[in-house]
Amino acid sequence: MAKLALIEREKKRARLVAKFAAKREALKAIVEDQSKSEEERYEARLELQQLPRNANPTRQRNRCAITGRPRGTFRKFGLARNKIREIAFRGEIPGLTKASW
């Protein structure tokens, strides 16, 4: 089980990403638009740098919804591999069966 502080930090990052997503996209569009003047693009780049670091989606980490485990997390379920195994054996994930051949 991950520390609660780490899990809360990830939740805070997710909120920041959602909060600044529209502004971030608008600024990135200005920076990448070649028809804009150099000064406008430079100002947009400076403004983009002023956004909080944690507003960048690449700083987010996928974590297990139950344990908070950062590694071995399946995006489809939002769970770590060991929790998927436990829940699947109990039959709580519809359509998921153990492989046999």
UniProtKB/Swiss-Prot annotation:
GO terms for cellular component: cytoplasm; small ribosomal subunit. Keywords: Ribonucleoprotein, Ribosomal protein, RNA-binding, rRNA-binding. Pfam families: Ribosomal_S14. The keyword Membrane does not apply. Part of the 30S ribosomal subunit. Contacts proteins S3 and S10. Belongs to the universal ribosomal protein uS14 family. Binds 16S rRNA, required for the assembly of 30S particles and may also be responsible for determining the conformation of the 16S rRNA at the A site. This is Small ribosomal subunit protein uS14. It comes from Burkholderia cenocepacia (strain HI2424). The lineage of its organism: Bacteria, Pseudomonadati, Pseudomonadota, Betaproteobacteria, Burkholderiales. The gene is rpsN.
